[in-house]
From Swiss-Prot:
Gene Ontology biological process: thiamine biosynthetic process; thiamine diphosphate biosynthetic process
Positions with a binding annotation for 4-amino-5-hydroxymethyl-2-methylpyrimidine: Q44
Signal peptide: none
Entry's EC annotation: 2.7.1.49, 2.7.4.7
Lineage: Bacteria, Bacillati, Cyanobacteriota, Cyanophyceae, Synechococcales
PANTHER family listed in its UniProt record: HYDROXYMETHYLPYRIMIDINE_PHOSPHOMETHYLPYRIMIDINE KINASE THI20-RELATED, PHOSPHOMETHYLPYRIMIDINE KINASE
Name of the protein in question: Hydroxymethylpyrimidine/phosphomethylpyrimidine kinase
Length: 263
């Protein structure tokens, strides 16, 4: 039996809510075999992050070489790459891969805190964005990349067009950090058509890892053979269901219910 394979290149979340833990659960839900290259190890739980340790770039390269030499993926996604050196390794490794590449540009948190330095932002912009089949920035990341404030639908459309001019084939701006009518609404632009990806807005504080999950679900659906817009639309519906069944665990922001049919 041929089983699709998807690769995640991201950080490890000791609390199990985001990063590769969320990605691998998402792949498994979609019946896709998940492989990974860990870029950093975080000490975190539902209350927050207390420590981040980067994996040496050579260590990231070794993981990628091991996976790609034996378990070639049908799609991949990237998450937290942390620094410019790791980003350069990742960009150089995935550039020759002619598969869907879902780039989650983890630069700014959902609260607006910048997570990487200017050198890393420059490498991300210049070397990773042009490799993206789909780029999935949140509202704050989109504002940073587009160099503009985003307040309404016209701003979303303009920002998506500016960002796509930086190289990605398609841009999906996530609306989870937005307010009012645009809360939870995602905006798609692929150079030819715009689409609003809108589902039921789920009122829950337990949203940890939702951005990781969306990008991973797009990659999983692409690995299964869906056309890329259809993969994004299916991923949006999956995230909505996982949010509806999010887990109220720990003392803070719990994770999504990735295996919601089971628990």
């Amino acid at each position: 039996m041929a089983v699709p394979i998807a690769l995640t290149i991201a950080g490890s979340d000791s609390g199990g809510g985001a990063g590769i833990q969320a990605d691998l659960r998402t792949f498994a839900f979609h019946q896709v075999h998940g492989t990974c290259a860990i870029t950093c190890v975080t000490a975190q739980n539902t209350l927050g992050v207390t420590r981040v340790d980067a994996i040496a770039p050579a260590g990231v390269a070794a993981q990628l070489d091991a996976v790609l030499s034996d378990l070639p993926p049908q799609a991949l996604k990237t998450g937290m790459l942390l620094n410019a050196e790791i980003m350069e390794v990742v960009a150089g490794t995935i550039a020759p891969l002619f598969i869907p590449r879902i780039i989650d540009p983890v630069m700014v948190s959902r609260t607006g805190a910048v997570l990487i330095d200017q050198a890393a932002i420059a490498v991300l912009r210049d070397h990773l964005l042009p490799l993206a089949t789909v780029l999935t920035p949140n509202r704050y990341e989109a504002q940073l990349l587009a160099g503009m404030d985003i307040q309404d639908a016209a701003d979303l459309d303009r920002a998506a067009r500016i960002i796509r001019d930086l190289g990605p084939q398609a841009v999906l701006i996530k609306g989870g950090a937005a307010t009012g009518d645009w809360h939870g609404v995602d905006w798609w632009w692929d150079g030819q058509q715009s689409h609003i990806l809108k589902t039921e807005a789920i009122a829950t504080p337990h949203t940890h890892g939702s951005g990781c999950t969306l990008a991973a679900a797009i990659a999983a659906n692409a690995a299964l053979g869906l056309e890329i817009l259809a993969a994004a639309q299916a991923a949006k519906h999956y995230v909505t269901k996982a949010l509806r069944h999010s887990l109220a665990i720990g003392q803070g922001q719990g994770p999504l219910g990735h295996f919601y049919p089971l628990f």
